[in-house]
């Protein structure tokens, strides 16, 4: 097939559960150059007089060329095409609980932003998940008796690590020269980023988005901040959605202020990046920040709807969500909430125009 276009921009999303794919080839409305599209089961090739753009599908994903349908041109957006795919089911997500922490291991805690060691060579004898943060509200709503553990926080012992929705609780009594005050921030000595807060004289909360935990014999993994934050948040959302059958979340700061309303649409998306070379006409902005030139890649991602709540935006909707027991709160440092909002906004701006909004919400992908 051939259409008139210039400076082709390629977007390809594969839905594993639906066994379908959406292909969008963007270009200006008027003028342009000749564009040819070749589709095979394992690749997609877009040729123009100036060069070509190629998308190679990862193992386990195959297009069905004969199923091309729904062809339409949307002004200001580009050529839309839907295909059937043969795709293996989504890989089972690795639990945030088990990815970094295993009982009996000697671990080191690092600041994710700069690599500064926060806790060195800590042997963890028990790694246990905590009850849900809104457990008391659930008991009050569904049980005929009061919560027997109300106002009785769980504190880890010296070699324990308790896992919350978005944080780790550890006992730092043996690591500190003087007894810390409760409800004070834990700041990285090198980069001054907020890593967590003290809950009592012995218990410290570290946020998963700020700390990397690795076996002590290993080294600090230098992961780009945006990639790390997207991965951690995406995994948390997938786990909470699966475990508690909730798909709506309020992202709030340590002060309780709501920054983002987030609604998980699906977790089976595969977003595929075209190979890039000097002859290729355009990069795919959603992924380019974390890939090297000349490479191609595919990312598992979750698709979310979101609404920002900063500067009193969406105040009534935020109040409604906060009062809804089916909406789960996720607490992060205030600076991280703003980081996440910036990532969502950038990812939204990189999507084709027709995909950027759904009803009154904005759309974005978070890479797993």
Swiss-Prot record:
Annotated stretches, region: HECT-like: 332-368
Intervals of motif BRAT1-like motif: 129-159
Biological function: E3 ubiquitin-protein ligase which accepts ubiquitin from specific E2 ubiquitin-conjugating enzymes, and transfers it to substrates, generally promoting their degradation by the proteasome. Independently of its E3 ubiquitin-protein ligase activity, acts as an inhibitor of CPSF3 endonuclease activity by blocking CPSF3 active site.
Residues that hold Zn(2+) according to the record: 144
Interaction with UBE2C, as annotated region: 214-236
Domain of life: Eukaryota
Gene Ontology cellular-component terms listed: cytosol; ubiquitin ligase complex
Pfam families on file: HECT_2
The organism's taxonomic lineage, starting at the top: Eukaryota, Metazoa, Chordata, Craniata, Vertebrata
Subunit structure: Interacts with UBE2C/UbcH10 (E2 ubiquitin-conjugating enzyme). In vitro, interacts with cyclin-B.
The keyword Metal-binding is assigned to this record: yes
InterPro entries: UBQ-conj_enz_E2-bd_prot
UniProt keyword terms in alphabetical order: Acetylation, Cytoplasm, Metal-binding, Transferase, Ubl conjugation, Ubl conjugation pathway, Zinc
Modified residues (N-acetylalanine): 2
The protein's name: E3 ubiquitin-protein ligase E3D
Catalytic activity: S-ubiquitinyl-[E2 ubiquitin-conjugating enzyme]-L-cysteine + [acceptor protein]-L-lysine = [E2 ubiquitin-conjugating enzyme]-L-cysteine + N(6)-ubiquitinyl-[acceptor protein]-L-lysine
Pathway: Protein modification; protein ubiquitination
Subcellular location: Cytoplasm
Molecular function GO terms recorded: cyclin binding; ribonuclease inhibitor activity; ubiquitin protein ligase activity; ubiquitin-like protein conjugating enzyme binding
PTM comment text: Ubiquitinated by UBCH10 (E2 ubiquitin-conjugating enzyme).
Keyword Metal-binding included in the entry's annotation: yes
GO biological process: protein autoubiquitination; protein monoubiquitination; protein polyubiquitination
Domains as described in the record: The C-terminal half (AA 188-389) is able to bind cyclin-B and shows a self-ubiquitination activity (mono-, poly, or multi-ubiquitination) in a HECT-like sequence dependent manner. The BRAT1-like motif mediates inhibition of the endonuclease activity of CPSF3 by forming hyrogen bond and hydrophobic interactions with the active site of CPSF3: Cys-144 coordinates one of the two active site zinc ions of CPSF3.
